[in-house]
């Protein structure tokens, strides 16, 4: 019987989901493994003893981080105490690099092995973080093959586990059945709205999406809108921004993407999820002007959407800051719905993404890495 313990640390909804899938795979591989950590609802449901709720820690932008500093500091202090009093056999840090790289140092100080799952985007900005990774991380589990090559070049132990979204299950229901379930007409266009999972994203982006929706309706009166509610958000949080035309659902995002003709999305992992389902999309991004200015100085990338970053050529229009207006969003969605040649061109490009990212079940691949680290 194993008395080994693993700590899973996730600070955002996307990491919470990855942590939940990893927990399930670890339990299948090693049923007696003790799992605890920092996360949200999904990890809790997967059997992880979550002793730090990460819901308040999911922030975007430099200024926004300062506003949540007290909660972040409290989480750090709690983990440091845990490392000293109840050291696990391994800590798995999932994404969330600003927080997790700092805590990886604390884990190593306590003599604990460290696995980092989902690489910080050192290829985009602050490549110097590779020094911390070399010093404090025993093994990297990365989602993209180019990241594996990067770490191999730097002599960092690494496994390319594939991207979990590339192997995500598809709904068992037909398109018509899903539309019936959501009370939507399968013969009329459906646009999915993804305003993000963080409160400040919702506040900035959802009102714009709602206004864009009204403009789209003037051009396409039959259009239908659907908004999948992020697990960490209550309906009351977004209700003030909504119009009656938008149908809010609490369901697996795969059901929404199975019926959507187009999508409007905040930048982030969701853009890749949408793209992998070959749903044409437009990406919008808006943060505090100072945050954006600082980001432009630090980040050396042509694109902000993950689907554009991993594709050989851009697959989605990006509307950033002052360019993100209701009219600009409406114009692009209209093209995605009504311009047949343009639409087919985008769908064709989206079709090339999955083969690049699929390595089977990513969570099972990471679980094997965990198993090797704690039993080696």
Swiss-Prot record:
GO terms for cellular component: membrane. SUPFAM superfamilies: UDP-Glycosyltransferase/glycogen phosphorylase. GO terms for biological process: lipid A biosynthetic process. It comes from the Bacteria. It catalyses: a lipid X + a UDP-2-N,3-O-bis[(3R)-3-hydroxyacyl]-alpha-D-glucosamine = a lipid A disaccharide + UDP + H(+). Its EC number is 2.4.1.182. Pathway: Bacterial outer membrane biogenesis; LPS lipid A biosynthesis. Keywords: Glycosyltransferase, Lipid A biosynthesis, Lipid biosynthesis, Lipid metabolism, Transferase. One of its GO terms (molecular function) is phospholipid binding. The keyword Cell cycle does not apply. Disulfide bonds: none annotated. The keyword Transferase applies. Belongs to the LpxB family. Condensation of UDP-2,3-diacylglucosamine and 2,3-diacylglucosamine-1-phosphate to form lipid A disaccharide, a precursor of lipid A, a phosphorylated glycolipid that anchors the lipopolysaccharide to the outer membrane of the cell. This is Lipid-A-disaccharide synthase. The gene is lpxB.
């Amino acid at each position: 019987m194993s008395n080994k313990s693993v700590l899973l640390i996730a600070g955002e909804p996307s990491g919470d989901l990855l942590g939940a899938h990893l927990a399930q795979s670890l339990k299948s591989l090693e049923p007696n493994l003790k799992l605890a950590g920092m996360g949200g609802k999904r990890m809790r449901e997967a059997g992880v003893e979550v002793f730090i709720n990460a819901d308040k820690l999911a922030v975007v932008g430099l200024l926004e981080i300062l506003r949540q500093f007290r909660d972040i500091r409290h989480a750090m202090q709690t983990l440091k105490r845990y490392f000293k009093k109840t050291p696990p056999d391994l800590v798995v840090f999932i994404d969330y690099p600003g927080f997790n790289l700092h805590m990886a140092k604390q884990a190593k100080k306590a003599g604990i092995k460290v696995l980092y799952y989902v690489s910080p985007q050192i290829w985009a900005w602050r490549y110097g973080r590779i020094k911390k990774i070399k010093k404090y991380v025993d093994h990297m589990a990365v989602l993209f093959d180019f990241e594996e090559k990067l770490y191999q070049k730097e002599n960092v132990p690494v496994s390319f586990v594939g991207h979990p979204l590339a192997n995500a299950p598809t709904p068992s229901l037909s398109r018509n059945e899903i539309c019936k379930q959501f009370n939507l007409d399968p013969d009329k266009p459906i646009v999915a709205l993804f305003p993000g999972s963080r409160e400040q994203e919702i506040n900035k982006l959802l009102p714009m999406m709602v206004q864009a929706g009204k403009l789209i309706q003037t051009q396409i009166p039959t259009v239908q809108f659907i908004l999948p509610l992020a697990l960490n958000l209550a309906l009351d949080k977004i209700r003030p921004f909504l119009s009656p035309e938008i149908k809010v659902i609490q369901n697996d995002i795969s059901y929404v993407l199975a019926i959507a003709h187009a999508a409007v999305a905040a930048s982030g992992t969701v853009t890749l999820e949408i793209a992998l389902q070959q749903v044409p999309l437009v990406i919008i991004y808006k943060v505090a002007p100072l945050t954006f200015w600082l980001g432009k100085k630090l980040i050396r990338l042509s694109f902000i959407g993950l689907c554009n970053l991993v594709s050989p050529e851009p697959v989605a229009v990006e509307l950033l800051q002052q360019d993100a207006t209701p009219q600009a969003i409406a114009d692009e969605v209209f093209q995605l719905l009504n311009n047949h040649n343009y639409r087919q061109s985008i769908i064709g490009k989206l079709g090339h993404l999955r083969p690049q990212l699929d390595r089977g079940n990513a969570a099972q691949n990471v679980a094997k890495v965990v198993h090797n680290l704690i039993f080696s």
